[in-house]
Amino acid sequence: MTSKDKAVVSLPVSPWDAILKAAKDQLPSLDSDSSLSDCEEEEPFIFQRNQPVLIPDLTEELAEDPVGVDESGTWVTAGRSPSPEPLLVPGRLAIEPRSEWMVRSKDLAHQERRGPGWSCQSCVKSSPILLDTKEAPAWPEGRGSQSPPWSSQGEGATFPLEGKLKTEPSDTDFKNSAKRRALRRERRKMIEREILQKVTQAAQNPASGDQGQVAELGPRPKATSEQSWEGRPVLSLKQLEGWDLDYILQSLPGQQGSQGDSASRSAWWLADRCQDQGHSTGPSQDILLEQLALLCATQSRVRHPTWKVSADKLQDTEEQVARTRSASAESGFQTERVQKRAESRRLKTEPPTVFLDLRLTEPSDPQEHQSQESSEHSSSDSEEEEVGSAGSIPVASSWEQRYCTGKSQLLQQLRAFRKGAVPPQLSAKDGPGGQKDQAQEDTGGSQTQRKKHIKLWAEKQNALNLGDPLGTRLLPGMGQL
């Protein structure tokens, strides 16, 4: 036992500390991905997408390329410094993308830190053939964007080499480089087919700064004329200017009426177009208005199927369409016929209007009021007035039957029945319609009737006050007053 275990044993152990110690062994640590209970080790599953869906990064492939081999298989070296030490320059490095330049510049900076006595053994292994700087051609001028990345680094970019190298490449290295180039070309073709199908014209014609990258990738396959027509439909303005829109407008109503004659109409339109290619004289404004009217008529028939049109009318409309195409002199006459037919259809479809006369008949009211007043005073006079009023009622009813509806006649009969059912004992003053009738009478007649009524009423009251049971006999007749 160690000293730590002795220290722990010497202290008094409580039951709570023992429980915590036992539980701490079973708890997983932060570094472990699974608890101690999981004895079986399982490999974690990593989801990966399909490779052709993603655009691959070609920088890794360019980094793995054999250094110093160009497309023709020749080895190129060039040097800028006047020192006798050779400088290794790959022939394809001038056309590499800028991202690859950054990778190579970082590698060179890392190599400079190792000191001047370090030997470039990796370069010897990857590119075993070098030429002297005097025999190598000068770097091409006029391409600032394609200059090597170490041109600004000065003498630190030169690498001292140990020993003499061979002047010819081996056959195995040449075959391996050819195989790699073939695989790279096949993969580029696959990428252009499956991934880069929707390449815009700007991407196909890049700027002058990216000409090196385009030269490296090689010429892309140009879209043929058939593939270009399969995309979006393109209409040039020259074709639209050559079309005659008037003839197209003429053919539209005919296509809606009958679809079978579309081929013959198109042939007729093409024949007229060939004849009048230089100058096309469009129809007048009247013909266009007539065609619009016919089109509206056909659309209204489709929207309102309840209108039943005979076969003769349909034939007439077809004949009108043919006449509009053949001759334009009868346009005004045909438009009038169309307007007349539209008006006749409106008149047929609209129902007749019904008028109800609910006015009160007032001429018979004053006569009835006079008959009620006279019936209170004497039976003979009341009978004569009732006969006169009864004779006036049928005259009014016969006059009203001519110019009134059934509802108004029923209302008038009901009003007459109610007036006939009123008891004769009620006076004109107490009756509900007495005040209205008196207000409507003339001023002269109303004053004389009031005077007579007041005199009769005063005499009747005097007789009742005297207690004469035969007071009614003292009342004079209507003729004696």
Swiss-Prot record:
<feature type="modified residue" description="Phosphoserine">
    <location>
        <position position="147"/>
    </location>
</feature>
<feature type="region of interest" description="Disordered">
    <location>
        <begin position="131"/>
        <end position="233"/>
    </location>
</feature>
<feature type="compositionally biased region" description="Polar residues">
    <location>
        <begin position="323"/>
        <end position="336"/>
    </location>
</feature>
<feature type="modified residue" description="Phosphoserine">
    <location>
        <position position="145"/>
    </location>
</feature>
<dbReference type="GO" id="GO:0070840">
    <property type="term" value="F:dynein complex binding"/>
</dbReference>
<feature type="compositionally biased region" description="Polar residues">
    <location>
        <begin position="144"/>
        <end position="155"/>
    </location>
</feature>
<feature type="compositionally biased region" description="Basic residues">
    <location>
        <begin position="177"/>
        <end position="188"/>
    </location>
</feature>
<dbReference type="GO" id="GO:0005737">
    <property type="term" value="C:cytoplasm"/>
</dbReference>
<feature type="modified residue" description="Phosphoserine">
    <location>
        <position position="328"/>
    </location>
</feature>
<comment type="function">
    <text>In cyliated cells, dynein axonemal particle-specific protein required for deployment of ODA to the axoneme. Interacts with outer dynein arm (ODA) subunits.</text>
</comment>
<keyword id="KW-0597">Phosphoprotein</keyword>
<feature type="region of interest" description="Disordered">
    <location>
        <begin position="306"/>
        <end position="397"/>
    </location>
</feature>
<feature type="region of interest" description="Disordered">
    <location>
        <begin position="415"/>
        <end position="454"/>
    </location>
</feature>
<protein>
    <recommendedName>
        <fullName>Dynein axonemal assembly factor 8</fullName>
    </recommendedName>
</protein>
<feature type="compositionally biased region" description="Basic and acidic residues">
    <location>
        <begin position="310"/>
        <end position="322"/>
    </location>
</feature>
<dbReference type="Pfam" id="PF15773">
    <property type="entry name" value="DAAP1"/>
</dbReference>
<feature type="modified residue" description="Phosphoserine">
    <location>
        <position position="83"/>
    </location>
</feature>
<feature type="compositionally biased region" description="Basic and acidic residues">
    <location>
        <begin position="359"/>
        <end position="380"/>
    </location>
</feature>
<dbReference type="InterPro" id="IPR031531">
    <property type="entry name" value="DNAAF8"/>
</dbReference>
<feature type="compositionally biased region" description="Basic and acidic residues">
    <location>
        <begin position="163"/>
        <end position="176"/>
    </location>
</feature>
<keyword id="KW-0963">Cytoplasm</keyword>
<feature type="compositionally biased region" description="Polar residues">
    <location>
        <begin position="198"/>
        <end position="211"/>
    </location>
</feature>
<feature type="compositionally biased region" description="Basic and acidic residues">
    <location>
        <begin position="337"/>
        <end position="349"/>
    </location>
</feature>
<feature type="region of interest" description="Disordered">
    <location>
        <begin position="70"/>
        <end position="91"/>
    </location>
</feature>
<dbReference type="GO" id="GO:0120293">
    <property type="term" value="C:dynein axonemal particle"/>
</dbReference>
<dbReference type="GO" id="GO:0036158">
    <property type="term" value="P:outer dynein arm assembly"/>
</dbReference>
